[in-house]
Amino acid sequence: GIVMREVQRKTEAPHFAPDHPKAVSDLMMWLERAERIRTQQRTDKNKLYALHAPEVECLAKGKARKPYEFGVKSAVVVSHKHGLVLGARTFPGNPYDGHILSAVLEQATNITQDLSVTIRQVVADLGFRGVDADNPGKEIIHRGRYKSLSPQQKGWLRRRQAVEPAIGHLKSDHRMDRCWLQGALGDALHAVSCAAGYNLRWLLRAIARLGLG
């Protein structure tokens, strides 16, 4: 607080940067963000977590080792058989998981429309339950329906665990864990770029495995 008050006193001087209004406005913006961080409380809503990126949100993961992550919510669609990433989207505002499923499936459908592939079954975690009416024509399978699933569907549900290492590789090998682009548009471009890099590396491994190189 002492440094902020000292800077504010100097900015109120009549001779302070009269020929640089842009620099003054930028300085006022940083001072406003610093004051917001200084005065916010633990239980406040819409807290500011990063000076350089006010769009950063706190995401509760529910894991003992890492209960919270800071950034923007992302959703990934992975193919069942080969593990290719069919869609990657960001959702500012930290919406409920079930409300983003239709948007993610729309992106995956647009990407695969030239392959004459129709997405009929969706295997997801419990966060996507209760949204069947919002996704007509799609069979949503999750472990909340385990007792009513067929043996084949139970196998699909076990196969769904393969998406977790795919997300881990996106974060560790393709730099999805930290976005260096600015704003919501930068977050969206970063997610798509990481997914494209993942698929390119998958394709290079397939070429080497089949001896086509």
Predicted regions and their residues:
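Hydrophobic (often cysteine-bearing) scaffold residues that line and stabilize catalytic clefts
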Residues: D97, L101, R159, L189-V192
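Helix-centered, glycine/charged polyanion-binding patches within enzymatic domains
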Residues: Q113-L189
